[in-house]
């Protein structure tokens, strides 16, 4: 009995030590994002993509303004990787299934899969984001807009959802709102070249509309 108790105690100690070790790894990677050596910053951003959590989005968002191109790219990819982790093996499996359905252009099944994900884990922002994308592709702009609202409630750093608003409001010819969200997206991620181009187009459309009203 004593031996069993000793083994169980050792297992509990190992389990308790594992969590702080991962936390330390995250903290070290976050600190390394401010290192003078760009190579270390790049690796730190990649590492956070592997082990980071939503709590690391603030430092990764700051790294989107790093002077090094690769560090910025790695930080952006790290954020997407963190967003794609739900914390539930069942939901992660469904998420992968939904991604495959999106890739195959199966909008109806994709919407059904992400709706199931949302029902199982409503706090998982990326489930809402992917369904918003599918609704947009299906032409249901109002539902897409509503899902984007749910994304940013849960993840205010989600420049992808903010970019989605731009596309939706542009389709609705609400150019002022589209420009508002384009600027918000760039405030978080200044590397969104497509959004910058959208701003140029939207400003032109806005001017043309004003001229027609004169």
Residue ranges and their predicted role:
Residues 97-100, 179-214:
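Terminal, low-structured helical/coil segments at or just beyond the last alpha-helical repeat
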Residues 21-32, 53-64, 88-95:
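Amphipathic alpha-helical scaffolding segments comprising HEAT/armadillo-like alpha-solenoid repeats
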Residues 51, 66, 120, 154-155, ...:
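Structural marker of alpha-solenoid helical repeat scaffolds
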């Amino acid at each position: 009995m004593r031996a069993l108790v000793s083994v169980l105690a050792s297992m509990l100690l190992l389990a308790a030590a594992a969590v702080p070790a991962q936390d330390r790894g995250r903290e070290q990677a976050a600190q390394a994002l401010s290192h003078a050596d760009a190579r270390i910053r790049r690796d730190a951003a990649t590492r956070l993509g592997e082990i980071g959590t939503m709590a690391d989005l603030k430092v990764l968002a700051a790294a989107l303004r790093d002077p090094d191109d690769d560090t910025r790219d790695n930080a952006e990819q790290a954020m997407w990787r963190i967003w794609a982790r739900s914390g539930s093996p069942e939901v992660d499996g469904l998420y992968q299934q939904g991604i495959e359905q999106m890739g195959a252009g199966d909008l109806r099944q994709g919407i059904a899969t992400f709706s199931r994900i949302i029902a199982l884990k409503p706090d998982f922002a990326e489930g809402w984001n992917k369904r918003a994308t599918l609704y947009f592709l299906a032409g249901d702009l109002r539902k897409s807009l509503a899902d984007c609202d749910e994304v940013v409630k849960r993840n205010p750093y989600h420049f992808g959802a903010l970019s989605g608003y731009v596309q939706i409001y542009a389709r609705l010819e609400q150019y002022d709102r589209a420009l508002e969200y384009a600027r918000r997206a760039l405030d978080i991620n200044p590397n969104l070249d497509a959004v910058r181009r959208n701003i140029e187009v939207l400003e032109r459309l806005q001017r043309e509309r004003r001229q027609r009203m004169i």
